[in-house]
Design a protein with these regions (language model features):
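Active-site-proximal specificity loops/subdomain of glycosyltransferases
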Residues: 271-344
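Catalytic core and acceptor-binding pocket of nucleotide-sugar-dependent glycosyltransferases
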Residues: 164, 359-363, 381, 387, ...
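Short, aromatic/basic amphipathic alpha-helical patches
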Residues: 96-103, 167-177, 261-275, 292-297
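A short alpha-helical cap/connector motif
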Residues: 1-157, 161-208, 487-496, 501-511, ...
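Well-ordered, non-membrane alpha-helical segments in soluble/globular domains
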Residues: 170-171, 228-243, 364-369, 443
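GT-A fold catalytic core of metal-dependent nucleotide-sugar glycosyltransferases
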Residues: 324-383
Length: 537
């Protein structure tokens, strides 16, 4: 089976004339207008144009569609009328008579996940250059193994690889990275992936080999200051949300305690062993480093000091933010500095990613690969809430509440900028502890930034968009407007206000996000007024 050239697939998809389906879909769904819009929606929102395009790459052959549902995928696959589409489902849900009578589509009530049934269709499967798979995440891996066992030489398009945790954990992450491709930007908003066991079939894939990502898990429920909130989020909780980080197909350094290591080792896919470095250390054994020298006090000593500071200078904070939790957050910077020094994968760029990043939503998982491909050099993090510089300089007032302006769950930079900013954050921590304060690592970002703004490159969003909005505002453009743009304007930081406005506007004009007229007008207002203050056209 000769493989087509997929290198320009995004451009080539534009040649598909989808209007030929207009009458078929309209006739079918007069009472369901959303179904009409769904079918004709653009790549990245719906996958039907991708399926139609792929059908044009092969002639006079058989295409398999597993999961007929309403018949829309079979309809798209029927675009090239020289091919025959065999569409399978265990229930008949094709209500559209125009779809049912398509001359090159045959619908079957058969379960191809039953291996006895699959064997009945084995010859047809082997003849099919590609298969479309749209089911539920519980049986796909068995079908993958079946295709592997019979020597299937085509490729399989899979729907919903990101949205459903079952699809991610039980299927997508179990396929070695060398065999799979994420084509969500060409397919469905919920995640579209392609896998193939044929080394001659290759789809475009970003090269993110220059990165080392760092993550960590320590069981803070064992710490002497574990609060009820900490205990509720025990090891079971974090491990249940860990696979999206542990299955990342990048160079990954994992810090953990001895107790957690076996469980983490079992969850990191074996095919990624060559891209994995484990550093095992008990939590209280961490030390900060100042001017290149490890300080004498370990985390146990700092925990006592932070608790003393909080008694002497009480403030309002979340009970989950114990002194040990604060120190865990601070360990990020010590771990990144150490990783940069060791540099086991000879990387140029480094990234912190939370162990349980999937809790922030599937869209962050979708956008991670694109975010890394940008290869920003400066320290880059999500600016969430503008805290004015005069308030930051008033340390006593600043520390009355947990005022956190930037996100520490995901941040990036090259070796130079990452090490420099991590070092500055550590130094600022030590400075505030000595002054009798201590809240959270994110509260250290603003004072470091205002003193070293040249080291930072921001993007904008809220916690749930800490990766999603790295390149563009893909989700929720409103929080940057009311949390950052309005507040930076009100506090006369017109440079950052304009920067944030342009970041949101660019995303909107490139159709990366939607925005109501109300918010768009508000955005324009602040943008134009801020530019007036800067005397820029």
């Amino acid at each position: 089976m000769t493989s087509p050239d997929f290198s320009n697939i995004k451009h080539d998809m534009e040649t598909v004339d989808f209007e030929q389906f207009r009458q078929i879909i309209n006739v079918a769904n007069q009472s369901l207008p959303d179904c009409i819009h769904e079918f004709f929606d653009v790549p990245g929102k719906q996958h039907y144009r991708l399926l139609a395009y792929l059908s044009t790459l092969y002639n006079n052959t058989t295409i398999i569609d597993i999961g007929s549902h309403r018949g829309n995928s079979a309809t798209a696959l029927s675009y090239n009328t020289t091919n025959t589409v065999h569409s399978f489902d265990i229930e008949d849900k094709v209500l559209n008579p125009a779809i049912r009578i398509l001359p090159n589509v045959q619908f079957h009530l058969d379960n191809l996940f039953d291996l006895l049934v699959a064997d009945k269709w084995k010859d047809t499967i082997l003849q099919s250059p590609f298969i479309f798979l749209d089911v539920n995440g519980s049986m796909e891996i068995d079908f993958y193994n079946y295709l592997k066992s019979i020597g299937y030489a085509g490729f399989v398009i899979c729907d919903d690889i990101w949205y459903f945790k079952e699809m991610r954990d039980n299927f997508w992450y179990k396929i070695p990275d060398e065999y799979r491709y994420d084509v969500t930007e060409l397919g469905h908003w919920s995640g579209t992936g392609i896998f193939t066991l044929n080394p001659d079939i290759r789809f475009p894939k970003r090269d993110n080999s220059a990165w080392t990502l760092v993550t960590a898990y320590f069981n803070l429920t064992k710490c002497p200051d574990a609060s009820e909130e900490i205990i509720k989020r025990d090891a079971t909780y974090y491990f249940s949300h860990s696979l999206s980080t542990l299955a990342l197909p990048y160079n990954l350094v994992i810090y953990c305690d001895n107790e957690s290591y076996p469980e983490i080792l079992s969850r990191r896919p074996e095919y990624l062993s060559s891209r994995t470095q484990y550093i095992i250390r008990e939590f209280d054994e961490f030390h900060f480093k100042k001017d290149g020298v490890l300080l004498d006090d370990n985390f146990a000593k700092y925990r006592d000091q932070i608790n003393k500071n909080r008694r002497n200078k009480p403030y309002h904070f979340d009970n989950r933010n114990t002194a040990s939790y604060y120190l865990f957050c601070m360990s990020r910077y010590a771990m990144l500095k150490e990783t940069i020094e060791l540099n086991p994968f000879k990387s140029s760029h480094f990234c912190w990613i939370n162990f349980c990043i999937e809790r922030m939503g599937y869209q962050n998982l979708i956008r991670l690969d694109e975010a890394l491909s940008i290869k920003r050099n400066k320290f880059s993090t999500c600016y969430i809430d503008y805290v004015p510089e005069p308030l930051v300089q008033n340390t006593e007032e600043y520390y009355r509440f947990g005022r956190c302006g930037m996100c520490s769950g995901f941040f990036t930079g090259n070796a130079h900028y990452m090490y420099k900013v991590c070092d500055l954050i550590e130094n600022k921590f030590l400075e505030y502890v000595q002054q009798g304060y201590g809240h959270a690592d994110e509260q250290l970002y603003s004072p470091v930034y205002f003193q070293n703004s040249q080291l930072f490159e921001h993007y904008y969003g809220d916690y749930l968009q800490m990766i999603t909005n790295y390149t563009y505002i893909y989700d929720s453009p409103e929080p940057p407007i009311y949390n950052f743009i309005t507040r930076s304007f009100d506090n006369a930081n017109y440079v950052k206000c304009v920067e944030a406005c342009e970041f949101v506007l660019k995303s909107y004009f490139l159709k990366k996000c939607n925005m109501s007229d109300e918010y768009l007008n508000e955005l324009y207002h602040y943008y134009m007024e801020a530019k007036k203050h800067l005397h820029t056209p």
